[in-house]
Amino acid sequence: MSTGLKLKDKFYYLLMAFYMAVIAYPLYLMVVTSLKPNAEVFTNPFGPPKTLYLDNYANMISRSNYGTYFGNSLVVAGVSIMMIVALSALAAYVLAKHRFRGSAALYAFFVAGLIIPIKLGTISILKLMIGWGLHDGLGSVILVSVATGIPFGVFILTDFIRMIPEELSSAARIDGCGEAAIFARIITPLLLPAIAAVAVVNFIPIWNDFWFPLVLLKSDAAKTVPLATALLFGQYQTNYGYVFAVLTMASVPVVLMYLLFSKWFIKGMTEGSVKG
Amino acid sequence: MKTFKHAKAVRTIAVLLVAAALAAGLSACAKKTEASKSVTLNLTSWRTEDIERMNRVNALFTKTHPNITINFQPVNDTEYDANMRAGLETDTGADIIWLRSYDTGRTAYDGGWLYDLTKVIPDLDKFPPSAVKAWSTAEGVTYGVPSVGVTHGVYYQKSIFEKYGLKEPSTWDEFIAVCETLKKGGENVFAQGALDDWTLYEVVFSGLGANFYGGESARQALMAGKAKLTDPNFVAAFKAIDSLQKYLPKGYEGLDYVSMQQMFGSGQAAMFMGGSWEIGVFEDLGSDSAKIGWFAPPVAKAGDKLQYCFHVDAGIGLNKKSKNLDAAIEYIKWVAGAEYAQAFMNELPGFFMYTPAKVTLTNSLAQEMFDAAGTADNTVRTVWEKLSAQSPSGNSLMGVALPGMMVDKYTPEQAAAYVQDQLASWYAPFKN
Amino acid sequence: MKRNDGKTGRRFDRLRTWVFRAAFLLPALLVYAVVLLIPILDSMRLSLYSGGGLVPTDFVGLANYVKIFTEESFSAHVWGAFRNNIVFFLIVTLIQNALGFFLALAVTRAVRGAAFFRKISFLPTTLSVLVVGFLFRQMLNPIWGLLGNYPWLGNEATALPALAVAVSWQFIGESILLYAIGIDGIPSEHLEAARIDGADWMQETRHIVLPALMPIVGMVTLLIFVGDFTQFDIVYSMTTTMANPRYTTDLFGSLFYRAAFSTPVRGGWGMGMGAAVSTIMVFVVSLGVAVWYYLFKGSRRGEV
């Protein structure tokens, strides 16, 4: 970029500072309010808390089933991502390395799913899950998350596998390995960066999904964190400090995940956008 | 050959993952059925504000029935109806379900999900007939224990009234005079907003407006199709509510129900048009019966009889498909009895039990509210019965018309016409 | 010599190859088709039915659609949601897309701190839309909020924009990320050549950066479009499924939820009608994608 004058840079940093403030302030407010007792929220709405009031968090953990909700979200995210990776990798391997009549169409078929909003089939998905006996169980949300994540997985992994030099597979084939063994022993280890990217990119929307848990899950034992957030917000609306503690707790895992794994995340998005 | 073993391995892993997911799902379902002797009954209602209090009340049941615990999981008021129905339809509903009166609760029975309680409720014949009707079919099947009624009126902060030397108004003109004085003094006259769709209809219109449209007799005429919402008496009610617009706080268009409660409870406004159920909320916020007073909806002219909206609020139903039917029946019998009634009214002042037993009210505000019914003509919320059975329901239409009127989107006449015309699209007695 | 990619070899080998291919493809294909694609088609089928309960059973043909488009109390909601969604989309595009583009330019500058800004800009996107909605709702409270006594969420003119601002605040980081990646991908020789020729920042942007980023602009626009026209969470958290005030914040997502899953008292229409709403959404989104394709791909087929 052009070399700026001192003034230009000052203006730039001012702009950036303003932008950072716009991002940070609501988050700051969320955390700070969660550390106040309800009365102080009204007398001192925007300033830092007078004391570090941890009761809101303590109450949330002891009075509500927060541990269960958190565990459910973890199971849903974990199992879904494993399945997305596994299923996508298997399909991507065939689509990348094999050319047969219809393979291009099949690939397009998968990738089209990137812009098909699964929400539009919700009524029938609910019907399906009830029919299979999966509603009000984590399995229903898992299956939905997997279906949503497969297009991106196939999209990313197919290209990635294509880039793996054919010589490696050919050499293995000469040695007597079958396709499946090639996949398991040679391709998969090389795929790890792409797998990590797919995993991290999918984690955020799966963790934060509200719509499908709202429609598919009913009993308390099955709720995930976003659903519990909405429930607790409704139950304790009159206690603002508590409500913000709930919001903060809901946000910590994903923010942490992002800060720790942003490298993989960016890698995943890079792959996706470069091809788009 | 070697290759096949590996292919199988990969495939097996994939299958196992799917199986693991299904197992996780099914086990979450299975968790609910407990094989042990101790039973947990799931109870649901729309009263999310009452978790602590309800737990204390239900603990009394567990004292006499040690192997039965009640797990109270309320759902936010606005989501409750859909949640309840969805739960019943998909067999994931609670065991004990609070039911709204008339059509909304009736759909649960019509769907075949509720247990017939006609022979289960002890002394059903001693319950007030108007209450029983709200949870029974015309053929005499009662599907909900008539549990709780609520009333509507105006709360006020005693200290603010004393400051201006104000007395509780009994007529509308006195009421407006009080509002004027407070406004001139710079006080927030009402902690009232126009954002939430239901508050203006359920409390302000049905509560304060009833004195203008003529209470129960007008409501009956309306349901029969003999009266219209565009008739002068109903329009007078709309107009009266509209006249309160200038006393609403700055920003009232964006003030939601919870903020309203907070505002009044923390002493930032002089009056609050609300329901008897709010007593507990205000107490929790620091405004107990020593600090706040209450008066009944002011009558239109001096000498009028009070038309008092004593609404049939909640009945208690039993899920036919409950996995702990016997324990649930025990609980139903208990909630229809005196011990529950007394404990409930102690913990949740402002809810008036229909139970035919002698109970004493400990809260002075609740006592005032209850006494007002003695000398009044009682009615229920305007378009609750029959007129909200289908879409667009009377309730949701009022929820658009009244807030719209309060932000001057509609005139009182237009608001009335809006509800009337939309109802006429499906309500047979209105089509002519 | 072992088989190669299935083109030669004995029939048994070919069969084995196909079995292998099927085994690898089917799991993903099945889950994708059965859980994502088929339900959408099935919902379209269900829209031709009516009746209470979870699964409508009376076949009524196009009666639901007739009802939706001829009866005022239904059509008002559908057209209202459509109009709101368009306004919503335009505001979000302006902030998230246009402003995001310029911010992406800013965070890719070769100055100290730019990488940090870039990393932080994505933070709001990691939150749940629900959390953002609740947060903004509290901030806009007329009594205790940040922005004074004005009823932002109560005034029909400002409520929907408030939702759009909240969503943009949250997702601008995603646009910045994608644009930044694109900017990173511009070969530095191009930029240097332009600099040598004396181009300033604005000319550089217009003639080099923007054309290079056009595919990404297209992708971001498409993502925003599909996301906005199915957006539900922000309405739920900021103005409830009743889309207060008076349905002026109603988007297709909230209309669909309310129509399909609420009781009549709260504005529900029954499952058959709800399915009709989701089918209408399918058409609207498809139409939008078709328009997008024409704008971003069709007219560019001749260019690089």
Model regions: which residues?
Chain A
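A structural signal for multi-pass alpha-helical bundles of membrane permease subunits
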Residues: 2-276
